[in-house]
């Protein structure tokens, strides 16, 4: 999609000046140019031949070498981005509440990337490719009331990530945010030096030049459940084990940044099916009030963090509620159908919307985070800002059971419109902008070049 002509913002809000664009990175070094020449020479073929000969002759002795591609030996790591030479990053003061503000129309600095240019996007969130006729949802910048968010600088961020692992843990909304982050960083990475590997509960994006990974791990309840297979699960059959977490949590060890969420999977019923202690069958379960079960899960989760996470190495974040927009009367459109045909945010507001969130769950997580003793948990409050974005969901321009909606399904939006997930580029980019701000606001230990997941 080519960039549209300068569009006139809706006459609802006074716009603030857009944030300045990221600074231009320094030029590549002469050694990079030399290596580029070598790649076009017979030296490449010679190195490859020796590599294959070693594999043939020594087999097990070069197993770890075989896990890397030839490119890992011919291509250097990314040149260090001289962050210290840039103007100081203007970060908001710790006292500024980033969750309170307004959406400002901005077709100058947004979108942060183009849908068609991010080949890693899944069909689920590729709304333009799926036929959405409007694109205004991409052009809204979040402006906190008393400060400003820094523009996401992919090179500055990846320097922070050099040699490190970041993992989003939770449900498909955390995957939505993970996809956004991949699209934000991938333009600065060399072709052939970035890829996604999907394996079981993992989706792993490898940024080879930085020896870094951005990962998503499927655990919709955080604890163990009968829905832990990311591809096969049923809404009406969800059963959880609130005190069992190890099968998931063993995969979270030695990760540098952990970003958790869990909410939407809890919202189908007031009571949750809970597997009985010491049971060997998922059919052996009780029904327990939702908030009670949620509390048990977070006791298990927080205990695991306190016992297994080294706060000197690992930073822990928790994303608050991402809203559903299923009841248009809540934003003054009683004749609407869910979020269908919504093209603008809620702009003229004087108080928060009431979207029927279970705020007991929000408050419970906030209390758990506040009471952590050894491992700080930073809450990233995305709820109110996202409440106003009734326009930005995938709606009828998504997939169901792996396929685009049929005309017959689109004719029944009450049943088939997805007002949970978000089009990309879009709202999750702002979530990542806040995450970026939080990470850069904190000092972090130097890279230890940990062992990354096998590719």
Curated annotation (Swiss-Prot):
Positions of glycan attachment: 82, 107, 146, 278, 348
Disulphide-bridged cysteine pairs: 96-147, 118-183, 127-423, 339-419
Short motif (DXXH motif): ranges: 418-421
E.C. no: 2.3.1.-
Its membrane topology: Single-pass type II membrane protein
Enzyme class per UniProt: transferase
Biased composition (Low complexity): 1-15
Motif (GDS motif): 170-172
Free-text tissue specificity from the UniProt record: Highly expressed in leaves. Expressed in roots, stems and inflorescences.
UniProt subcellular location: Golgi apparatus membrane
Protein name: Xylan O-acetyltransferase 3
Organism whose genome encodes this protein: Oryza sativa subsp. japonica
Gene name in the database record: XOAT3
